[in-house]
Structure formats: structure tokens, C-alpha cells
Amino acid sequence: TTFDVCEIDLLDPDDLQPPYNEPVLSGGPCDMAAATHEDAVFDFSNGDQACFKILRTWTVMDWCQMNTQTGGLWSHIQVIKVMNSVAPEIEPIADLDECSFDPQCGGLTLDFEAIAEDDCSGPGALTWKYYIDENNDETFEYTSGQSTGASVEFSRYIPLGDHRIVYTVWHRCGNNTTEEQLVTIRNCKPPSAKCIHGLSTN
């Protein structure tokens, strides 16, 4: 059984419609059957099969037939899969336009952060990577490792010029979102006059 529901609490038998909420039992007027269940939840890292899967083990006991020697106890595993096609959303990231006053025409070390929200995964189930394209020439000079959380934060030295940072986040269902941030570092140090010793003018 596959559902497009992300909250495990909404998959409780009391919240499901027949025939998914409990076993369908048939018996005689003298039967006294009762059903109980136990869940085991499994996450999938790539989301190809499902966001997560619940193996719900139903146990049915007939008190009229219950005997440790002869039976009266039956079990069945119900497989519940959760799929989701909605990718996480990255909050808008402002482009940066910064000034460097370094006398040697150096750049700046800046702090970066991207934040995402998702309707199907908690913060710990979001995975991030980011890529740095120096000079914005479609070539990535740096690719980060993977990190998890509701946000990704890092500090990085950025040289003078126009650059691009690409953030990618995905959740346990395998859907991903990409957001770009443009970064411009300008040389804002004004020119300074220098005296040349031994030079005179009339």
C-alpha cells in the first residue's frame, strides 16, 4: 500500500480507511477475535523505493481457539510505503556585493548560509552540497562534501571578481532543489600618491 502522507502519525490504523486500517476478519458466531499491531519503520537514503516504509505486523488472536499447543494465533505483515514528489524549498538567498580594502588587492573571507524547509522530512533528513564557481565561468573550483540539517553554513575566502555559489538540497524521498547566489568582490581601496625621491619638476 502506498500513501502520499509524510506524518507517521497520520498512518495510524485509526486514521486510515478500510481495508487498510485493520485486518478483515471472518468467523462464526462463537469466535472472539482481536487484532493488535506493531510497527517497524525503515528509511530509504535515495528515495527510489519510497521515502520510508512501515512494516506493520498484525497479530490476530481468537480467544475461543487460543491454545499454545494447537494455535488460535495468526499474523500478517502489512507493507506501507510513503512516496512524495514535492522537493524541499530553499529560502531566497540574497546576492552579495562587497568591498575589499586590502592593499594587496586581496579578496574577503565571507560567511554563507542557506536554509530549507520540507513538507516530508524533518531538519535532520535534509542533505546539502554546495559548489563554488570562481569567476562565474561555468567551472566549479570547489565542491563540498555532504552535510545534513535544516541549513548549511560555511566560511570561504572569495577573491576579487564575480563568482557564483550553487546550493543543492534533497530529502529522503530523493527530490532536490537548487538555488544560486551571485557574489561580487570589488577593490574599493582608493589609489594613493607616492613620492619618488630624487625627482624634481619646475
Question: How would you describe each model-predicted region?
Answer:
Residues T1-N202:
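Proline-threonine-serine-rich low-complexity tracts
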